[in-house]
Amino acid sequence: MHSKVIIIGSGPAGHTAAIYLARAELKPVLYEGMLANGIAAGGQLTTTTDVENYPGFPDGIMGPLLMEKFREQSVKYGTCIITETVSKLDLSKRPFKYWCESDENTCHTADVVVMATGAYARRLHIPGEETYWQRGISACAVCDGAAPIFRGKCLSVVGGGDSAAEESLFLTRYATKVYLLVRRDKLRASAVMAKRLLNHPKIEVIWNTVVLRSLGDGHLLNRLEIKNVKTQVVSELHVSGLFYAIGHEPATALVRGQVECDDNGYIITKNGGPETNIKGFFAAGDVQDKKWRQAVTSAGSGCMAGLAAERLLAEEEEMKNIEKNKK
């Protein structure tokens, strides 16, 4: 099968790109993945309960429902959505070649590829994590910290870098107390962030500490089992929230070694846009954004990728017509 443009990924970036491309009558094909990176089609928002910071929903909206609406709009304008995972992609020349997980013997081609596979938060994979995921455990304080289950409660953050410091400081707006659990005896955060963190009256840093288990009543998290790695003393910490701030992994394994990426694996784009060092290959959303990582910024990035892809295809079509008329 040959397509003018395919989109790999089904989060806000992928669907927004699809909507713009479909409205331009380019008949985009969107591969939404089948539990790619352990996440269902729709990306990280499908694991989020209330989304309260996406414009247009003053009362908030459930993450899975928001992604259903994205998908519905993509289909409405003519996007062909395939519930399949792209397992191999060859960017050596155009049209680009790709293969799908269910049939790796069949090669497909596309003139343009929009990569919107996102990034996923690193987890601790501790006992109780699955039970209390989005029931007290989260990987995004900005996304979830204002939720009713966290307001006026004692909360905890795991990590030692700038992200952990930022998330801890953010949570002080809603929490009565924030515990920052740091595995080492010092922070990796910048001096400025560390100073703000250590001087905040609501924040207490617990050094040399790891989380062993998350515990609760079967419905909501209410405490953690923690261990001091120097003394080996195990104790319980009573908190209603545990936020992971131990980094993200961009889902770029498909293209590493082919397209320019930074040291952390994020695709490098040009001048804040979606263009990469390979003509016809665009990146959108968290796959190229290690700073903001919000649904609304991903959607904006997808818009740019859709418009850029449309413009490239239009320019190339115009050049073909000029060459044809010369003959």
Curated annotation (Swiss-Prot):
Cited Pfam families: Pyr_redox_2
Biological process (GO), any one: removal of superoxide radicals
Subcellular location: Cytoplasm
Superkingdom of origin: Eukaryota
Role noted for this protein: Component of the thioredoxin-thioredoxin reductase system which may be involved in biosynthesis of penicillins and cephalosporins and may be important in determining the thiol-disulfide redox balance.
Subunit comment: Homodimer.
Protein name per its UniProtKB record: Thioredoxin reductase
Lineage: Eukaryota, Fungi, Dikarya, Ascomycota, Taphrinomycotina
Gene encoding the protein: TRR1
